[in-house]
Swiss-Prot record:
Biological-process GO terms, alphabetical: response to wounding
Keyword Hydrolase: no
Role this protein plays: Inhibits subtilisin-type microbial serine proteases including proteinase K, subtilisin BPN', subtilisin Carlsberg, subtilisin E, A.oryzae protease and S.griseus alkaline protease. Weakly inhibits pronase E. Does not inhibit trypsin or chymotrypsin.
Protein name: Subtilisin inhibitor CLSI-I
Superkingdom of source: Eukaryota
Key words of the record: Protease inhibitor, Serine protease inhibitor
Site (Reactive bond): A41, D42
Pfam families listed in its UniProt record: potato_inhibit
SUPFAM superfamilies: CI-2 family of serine protease inhibitors
Family indicated by similarity: Belongs to the protease inhibitor I13 (potato type I serine protease inhibitor) family.
MF GO annotations: serine-type endopeptidase inhibitor activity
Amino acid sequence: STRKTSWPELVGVTAEEAEKIKEEMSGVEIQVVPPGSFVTADYKPQRVRLYVDESNKVTRTPGIG
């Protein structure tokens, strides 16, 4: 099976709901990124960043990296 690398269907849901990615991918590290936060530019194949707004809703398509 092809490994999923992005989750466009999660835009607009809460970070808590989006953490279901963990059920699809074992060993993945979820990082929630609040508005105005700085993130490193490094790439990690086991990391998914959830960019959220003030309401904790995902604002960008989560993806591997």
